[in-house]
A protein has these predicted regions:
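Surface-exposed interaction/gating patches
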Residues: 12-19, 140-206, 212-217, 226-241
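Short loop/beta submotifs within extracellular cysteine-rich repeat domains
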Residues: 36, 55-56, 206-207, 216-217
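Short, structured coil/loop segments at alpha-helix boundaries
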Residues: 62-65, 214-218
Length: 241
């Protein structure tokens, strides 16, 4: 497999999903320019948008997101990768060694395939407009709001336990053929860390992996302790100014 191969035919981030107590994160996303544009047809979940960025806020009880919240608190609990053929990509990922996740779906809902990612969070594989099928758009809100000028996801990071950075680098390379584009070794007496920046074959999905340096008592360890495990630490957006 060469560095240009795109075995799962990825073509960018489709969405990032967050979980919290009901309504807890609404003000956060509204403050930075997102608009609530649609509600899920059968679940307590909402689609927020700005530019090309899709954020799903999931408040549904007894869902995978609810269980994720009990373990980690308010957080990014899933992400969606856009692909040309989700069923084909899912089959290929399982053949390569990915672990499938099967979620409970309601009547007339799309069955969106998913595999287990960082911290047990789902990575959904999406090949169509899931929102028109599963969400009801609000009539009085623009479906593609401009907001404050954020228009695309640049990257998101994973904070991992010391010694696990290579494990996750291997995971992304094996399943998706991500490639390393940068390696940082940031020295500091108390806050040193190493970071391996990965990018998907499409060049649109970028995920830096971070772990603490030798002492292991820095900012990465602080996140892992507070979050109660490995996970998505931050998301960076591209803006127009």
């Amino acid at each position: 497999m060469n560095e240009l191969a795109n075995p799962l035919e990825l073509c960018g981030f489709e969405f990032i999903e967050f979980v919290s107590e009901d309504g807890q994160l609404d003000a956060v996303f509204e403050t930075i320019g997102f608009s609530k544009v649609a509600k899920h047809k059968s679940k307590n979940a909402y689609l927020w948008r700005q530019g090309k960025i899709n954020i799903i806020l999931n408040y549904q009880p007894e869902s995978y997101a609810a269980y994720f919240y009990k373990e980690h608190g308010p957080s990014a609990c899933a992400m969606g990768f856009r692909t040309k053929n989700a069923a084909k990509a899912f089959k290929k990922a399982i053949e390569i060694g990915a672990e499938p996740i099967y979620n409970q779906i309601g009547p007339m809902e799309l069955n969106i395939p998913a595999i287990k990612g960082i911290g047990g969070s789902p990575i959904f594989l999406v090949d169509c407009d899931i929102y028109q099928n599963d969400f009801i758009f609000f009539d009085d809100v623009a479906s593609n709001p401009v907001g404050t000028g954020l228009y695309e996801i640049d990257h998101l990071t994973h904070n991992v336990y010391k010694g696990r950075m290579q494990y996750w680098a291997d995971f992304y390379e094996k399943i998706f053929n991500f490639q390393e584009i940068r390696y940082f070794d940031i020295k500091g007496e108390y806050t040193g860390l190493t970071s391996k920046a990965l990018t998907a074959p499409d060049g649109k999905i970028r995920i830096p992996l971070n772990e603490d340096s030798d002492k292991g008592n820095g900012q990465i360890a602080e996140f892992l302790n507070e979050f109660n495990g490995e996970g998505i630490q931050h998301i960076a957006f591209i803006c127009d100014d």
